[in-house]
Amino acid sequence: MYAVLVTGGKQYRVVQGETLRVEKLDVETGSDVTFNSVLLMGSSDGIHVGEALKDASVTAKVVAHGRARKVRIIKFRRRKHHMKHQGHRQYYTEIQITGISGPAKQ
C-alpha cells in the first residue's frame, strides 16, 4: 500500500517503512506525527483519489532534525565587475513511515 501526502507545501509518495526528509516540523525527535492531508492511496484493491481523502492518514516517527547542504546563489551584472554571493541551508526533519490507514471499503 502506498499514499501521497502533503506537508510543507510538497507532495511525497510514501510506503510503510520508508525514511524520507520533509520540510522542518516543530516536533521532538522520537515522537510520532500524523499526516491527515492524504491526496491518493493505492493498494491491491485499487486507487482512492480525492482532494483530501476522509478517514485516511499516514503516521510517522521523527528520526532526526538537520540542515541540508548549502545552496549557493550568485548574482552578477555583466560587464560591470559586480558579483554578489549568497547562500543558505534549509532545515529538514527526517521521518520514518510507520503506518498508512485508508478509508473504509465501499
Curated annotation (Swiss-Prot):
One Pfam family of this chain: Ribosomal_L21p
Matches recorded under SUPFAM superfamilies: L21p-like
One of the record's GO molecular function terms: rRNA binding
Record keyword Thylakoid present: no
Cross-referenced InterPro entries: bL21-like, bL21-like_sf, Ribosomal_bL21, Ribosomal_bL21_CS
GO terms, biological process: translation
Keywords assigned: Ribonucleoprotein, Ribosomal protein, RNA-binding, rRNA-binding
Source taxon at top rank: Bacteria
Gene Ontology CC: one annotated term: ribonucleoprotein complex
PANTHER family per record: 50S RIBOSOMAL PROTEIN L21, LARGE RIBOSOMAL SUBUNIT PROTEIN BL21M
Family: Belongs to the bacterial ribosomal protein bL21 family.
UniProt-listed NCBIfam families: L21
HAMAP family attached to this UniProt entry: Ribosomal_bL21
Binding partners and assembly: Part of the 50S ribosomal subunit. Contacts protein L20.
Function, in words: This protein binds to 23S rRNA in the presence of protein L20.
This protein's name: Large ribosomal subunit protein bL21
Annotated organism of origin: Xylella fastidiosa (strain 9a5c)
Classification of source organism: Bacteria, Pseudomonadati, Pseudomonadota, Gammaproteobacteria, Lysobacterales
Gene name for this UniProt entry: rplU
